[in-house]
Amino acid sequence: MATFKDACFHYRRLTALNRRLCNIGANSIWMPVPDAKIKGWCLECCQIADLTHCYGCSLPHVCKWCVQNRRCFLDNEPHLLKLQQLKHPITKDKLQCIIDLYNIIFPINDKVIRKFERMIKQRECRNQYKIEWYNHKLLPITLNAAAFKFDENNLYYVFGLYEKSVSDIYAPYRIVNFINEFDKLLLDHINFTRMSNLPIELRAITQEYFQLSRLPSSKLKQIYFSDFTKETVIFNTYTKTPGRSIYRNVTEFNWRDELELYTDLKNDKNKLIAAMMTSKYTRFYAHDNNFGRLKMTIFELGHHCQPNYVASNHPGNASDIQYCKWCNIKYFLSKIDWRIRDMYNLLMEFIKDCYKSNVNVGHCSSVENIYPLIKRLIWSLFTNHMDQTIEEVFNHMSPVSVEGTNVIMLILGLNISLYNEIKRTLNVDSIPMVLNLNEFSSIVKSISSKWYNVDELDKLPMSIKSTEELIEMKNSGTLTEEFELLISNSEDDNE
């Protein structure tokens, strides 16, 4: 199962390029790191191990040994993991580049075999050869790859020798096989040519090769926000916005496309060595404003929200209530995006004003039938069930029929923020005292989408961007969000 790891250990002594490419963490000293309790293939050493999150993409795809090298397949440094990575769409020319890569880095010929035999004979307690001593020379070329599906057109494939099997239900990738996209007979011929140089007793690799090269492809898994680790998330207490640390190996050398990189691998190895020698481990601080985080935060908000506020007599915002056991939610909102906090305040204030204008209620300790609906309303924000839930909330406010249209009253005083929001939404000069269902629904939707345009939000964090994209966004100033001018300097807001 450690064929690829053993090959990296022995082949790194062949050339100067191999000394840099084949230096993987699995052949180094182990350092303790937290794991994600996910079993799968480490993409760097191709072993089945407990995976931990990568500092480059925040996804669990490296083992506890290889993570110390801080390499990601999204780097632009041409290390081995980067060279094994191809982006969708996959063509036959790209697959040929993978085959050329293995033939260059892990050659099997008479010269290499004699060199390894001399190295083995120099060791102690080697009275007879055993097949496992040659494990590093039994590396077949397969076209199996770990596929990362960020969306329909954004897929990455990391090729490697993935031996054995493991339940990868929680891993962010799936193993796919591109042998049909290449040529089965041609790939067999390439491997048989490599095997012909091996001693007769070692040619049993043929059976292992066929088992690995004919693996069926798994169904691709769509990556969601929950697959990304929380370890790289940083909450900015000044701007009150979440961000994410992204670490990448950055080199000043550039290649127009993947094919040009492999051309330099064959014809200009010194360029790759220079790129790896001059690369810098760079930290990018990016905002974490995406649809996945928005849905997660909305779910947590619905879990922690206190619907009793709509029946209360508190004059302040819902997020500022501290000493009421039925309405206090400040413990949760202290470290949450300020946009979610503002949305929660406006939404709860609006429902409170509408509810108390139409229903005879006591105070926040009252038990009202509308309470479960308010939680459902928050959970349904930005979903297809939003209209249905809004209508149910509206019907719980004792609407009356006027000329065949159900309406509710809005007669309580409004704070300035909600007053301006309703005027802007309804496009009126003065706030109406009567609201129908369409107007009520428009106001709720306007409040929820005040700070979030779902159509323009990325579905996943910025850590899935390539290094070139991160550099370009950093230079253009779009990598982070700045809201200092929108944040109050009052002591209460900065608690």
From Swiss-Prot:
Q: Name one Pfam family in it.
A: Rota_NS53
- Assembly description: Interacts (via C-terminus) with host IRF3; this interaction leads to IRF3 degradation. Interacts with host IRF7; this interaction leads to IRF7 degradation. Interacts with host CUL1 and CUL3.
Q: Where is this motif: pLxIS motif?
A: 485-488
Biological function:
Plays a role in the inhibition of host innate immunity by inducing the degradation of key host factors required to activate interferon production such as IRF3, IRF5 or IRF7. Associates with components of cullin RING ligases (CRLs) including CUL1 or CUL3, which are essential multisubunit ubiquitination complexes, to modulate their activities.
Chain positions covered by the region annotation Important for cytoskeleton localization: 82-177
Indicate the segments annotated as coiled coil, or none if absent: none
Write the record's keywords in alphabetical order, separated by commas: Host cytoplasm, Host cytoskeleton, Host-virus interaction, Inhibition of host innate immune response by virus, Inhibition of host IRF3 by virus, Inhibition of host IRF7 by virus, Inhibition of host RLR pathway by virus, Interferon antiviral system evasion, Metal-binding, RNA-binding, Viral immunoevasion
Q: Which InterPro entries match?
A: Rotavirus_NSP1
User: Where located?
Assistant: Host cytoplasm, Host cytoskeleton
User: What segment(s) does the record annotate as region Zinc-binding domain?
Assistant: 42-79
> What note about domains is in the entry?
The integrity of the zinc-binding domain in NSP1 is important for degradation of host IRF3.
Its name, as the record gives it, is: Non-structural protein 1
| Taxonomy of the source species | Viruses, Riboviria, Orthornavirae, Duplornaviricota, Resentoviricetes
Instruction: Give an example GO molecular function.
Output: RNA binding
Its Gene Ontology biological processes?
Answer: symbiont-mediated suppression of host cytoplasmic pattern recognition receptor signaling pathway via inhibition of IRF3 activity; symbiont-mediated suppression of host cytoplasmic pattern recognition receptor signaling pathway via inhibition of IRF7 activity
RNA-binding, as annotated region: 1-81
Cite a GO CC annotation.
host cytoskeleton
UniProt lists the family membership as follows: Belongs to the rotavirus NSP1 family.
Location of region: Interaction with host IRF3: 320-495
Tell me where it mainly resides: host cell
Keyword Metal-binding attached: yes
